[in-house]
């Protein structure tokens, strides 16, 4: 009798118990909701005993995996700090503005006057406009974002980490 369950035990040995419990619950609810006549007719048509139950179990397993991945994705999204979300959504042009800051830690950024990228970053609250001089504007990286940039910057990928 134990030889029948050995392959199943090996299959589910690396699966989290929570996912296995979800699979069993989905499997039970699906079998309970599907009419008995349909199950009997399906197994009689295919002439393979218990095929319908095996298919429903496989379906339950896939649904449980999908829901656990979806839940993990949603948790990961909502566990991010608001500042981290802003940094993750920066474009390549916006990240290029901070190249000097990320290398040296210099909080002052210079750019040509009326630069649209700088205006976007100012609206996002990442930088503050300090002064203008001949064809040049000076900006300061805010203290809050300078901390998060240093914390989440990955110099290898040249992106901010999650």
UniProtKB/Swiss-Prot annotation:
GO cellular component, one term: plasma membrane
Source organism of the structure: Escherichia coli (strain K12)
UniProt keyword terms in alphabetical order: Cell inner membrane, Cell membrane, Membrane, Transmembrane, Transmembrane helix
Gene that produces this protein: sieB
UniProt keyword Membrane present: yes
Pfam families in alphabetical order: SieB
Major location (coarse): membrane
Parts forming coiled coils: none
Transmembrane segments: 22-42, 48-68
Name of this chain's protein: Superinfection exclusion protein B
Disulfide-bonded cysteines: none
Compartment(s) where it occurs, according to its Swiss-Prot or TrEMBL record: Cell inner membrane
InterPro entries: SieB
Taxonomy of the source species: Bacteria, Pseudomonadati, Pseudomonadota, Gammaproteobacteria, Enterobacterales
Recorded superkingdom: Bacteria
Membrane topology summary: Multi-pass membrane protein
UniProt entry tagged with the keyword Acetylation: no
